[in-house]
Amino acid sequence: MKSGIHPDYHPVVFQDATTGATFLTRSTITSSRTIEWETPHGVRTYPLVVVEITSDSHPFWTGSRRIVDTAGQVEKFHRRYGSRRQTNHRDDAAHSP
């Protein structure tokens, strides 16, 4: 591999925000939050990334239904950017002198 062109690929702990389940894997993502994780070589500190849905809570893997708050995301978008009215440029061109 060429040195200096690849992102830093390191161990990271992901935590499911719903269930609290954690798992250690490798990723290029970084976080200022950390967690102590017990390994066969002793306790080590790893970056902690909290995610909304993992295989531990996703309906496809659990077989149960779970309502995801997409409506809240849409409302947040409308509050932030407002409901902008789309103009029809053909109508504007027809009424211009």
From Swiss-Prot:
The entry's keywords: Ribonucleoprotein, Ribosomal protein
One of the protein's GO biological processes: translation
Keyword Ribosomal protein included in the entry's annotation: yes
SUPFAM superfamilies: L28p-like
GO molecular function, one term: structural constituent of ribosome
Any one GO CC term of the record: ribosome
Listed Pfam families: Ribosomal_L31 (PF01197)
Origin: domain of life: Bacteria
Subunit and partners: Part of the 50S ribosomal subunit.
Family per similarity comment: Belongs to the bacterial ribosomal protein bL31 family. Type B subfamily.
Name of the molecule in the record: Large ribosomal subunit protein bL31B
Origin species: Mycolicibacterium paratuberculosis (strain ATCC BAA-968 / K-10)
High-level lineage: Bacteria, Bacillati, Actinomycetota, Actinomycetes, Mycobacteriales
Gene from which the chain derives: rpmE2
